[in-house]
From Swiss-Prot:
UniProt source species: Escherichia coli (strain 55989 / EAEC)
Position of the signal peptide: none
Protein name per UniProt: Acetyl esterase
Subunit text: Homodimer. Interacts with MalT and MelA.
Assigned protein family: Belongs to the 'GDXG' lipolytic enzyme family.
Gene that encodes it: aes
HAMAP family: Acetyl_esterase
Its EC number(s): 3.1.1.-
Location in or out of the cell: Cytoplasm
Length: 319
């Protein structure tokens, strides 16, 4: 697709989305487009500080959890002593960026709105860790907390997975991994998926959308994939291309959120249509006027706050 054939996205987004796009952080250095991944990670963490400010206060605990690869950091957000369930949150960032700090506000709001314990898992990033290591560490953390639930005073009888972007893929992939391998980590009550990628390699939205404003050009998407996967065969794995998994049975209830001007939107639409066609419990909601990653911007965007409330409400309705 020639760039000039793409939609004029920045002219079409909502007023509050435009406010976010035009928000300047004077103390922030320029994006290191040609820098190392380490420099890009550092910039991403700095840039997200502004958007994470003002989040709800609540009891927070940090634990290192053992896996076969080593220790993985986790952070527990506890809005009340007697939580009805536990939600595991997987951050976005194209598999190569992000951490528990970059998504702190999202996790706090999700905990506040659901009144469930939220556990953020700082899964290993790529390219240092290749598929399926992140999923294996996520599953290991879930199993650890299930086994140690009494010691950590958390309710693991009912759990859920949630994530944005690449984290949404990891959330659903982890739920399917537990199902397929018959691993008991508590009943999976629901999966919350904000603007994820689930296995499409081409689509209408991937052609019409994506640019420097969201870091999701076709070249960007290819770069993230090459960093994450170990080899070409992994592209067809049912835990990367989730459409190659069995979506006709025992899929936990899924809340699927799409951003109107996100090149990954067709992934969400296809996931919803596939699940619905096979009578798997699911809900799809499109958020008009939004770009990919809008969930970060709840300081300025009512739509971002609404999307988090919607996900929390969906999850608690399954309990």
């Amino acid at each position: 697709m020639k760039p000039e054939n793409k939609l004029p996205v920045l002219d079409l987004i909502s007023a509050e989305m435009k406010t976010v796009v035009n928000t300047l952080q004077p103390d922030l250095p320029s994006w290191p487009a040609t820098g190392t991944i380490a420099e890009q990670r550092q910039y991403y963490t700095l840039e997200r500080r502004f958007w994470n400010a003002g989040a709800p206060e609540m009891a927070t605990r940090a634990y290192m959890v053992p896996t076969k690869y080593g220790q993985v950091e986790t952070r527990l957000f506890c809005p009340q002593p007697d939580s009805p369930a536990t939600l595991f949150y997987l951050h976005g960032g194209g598999f190569i960026l992000g951490n528990l700090d970059t998504h702190d506000r999202i996790m706090r709001l999700l905990a506040s709105y659901s009144q469930c314990t939220v556990i953020g898992i700082d899964y290993p990033l790529s390219p240092e860790a290749r598929f399926p290591q992140a999923i294996e560490e996520i599953v290991a953390a879930c199993c650890y907390f299930h086994q140690q639930a009494e010691d950590y005073q958390i309710n693991m009888s009912r759990i859920g997975f949630a994530g944005d972007s690449a984290g949404a893929m990891l959330a659903l992939a982890s739920a399917l991994w537990l199902r397929d391998k018959q691993i008991d980590c508590g009943k999976i009550a629901g999966v919350l998926l904000w603007y994820g990628l689930y296995g499409l390699r081409d689509s209408v939205t991937r052609r019409l959308l994506g640019g420097v404003w969201d870091g999701l050009t076709q070249q960007d998407l290819q770069m993230y994939e090459e960093a994450y996967l170990s080899n070409d065969a992994d592209r067809e794995s049912p835990y990367y291309c989730l459409f190659n998994n069995d979506l006709t049975r025992e899929v936990p209830p899924c809340f699927i959120a799409g951003a109107e001007f996100d090149p990954l939107l067709d992934d969400s639409r296809l996931l919803y249509q596939t699940l619905a066609a096979h009578q798997q419990p699911c809900e799809f909601k499109l958020y008009p006027g939004t770009l990919h990653a809008f969930l970060h911007y709840s300081r300025m965007m009512k739509t971002a706050d609404e999307a988090l409330r919607d996900g929390a409400q969906f999850f608690t309705a399954q309990l």
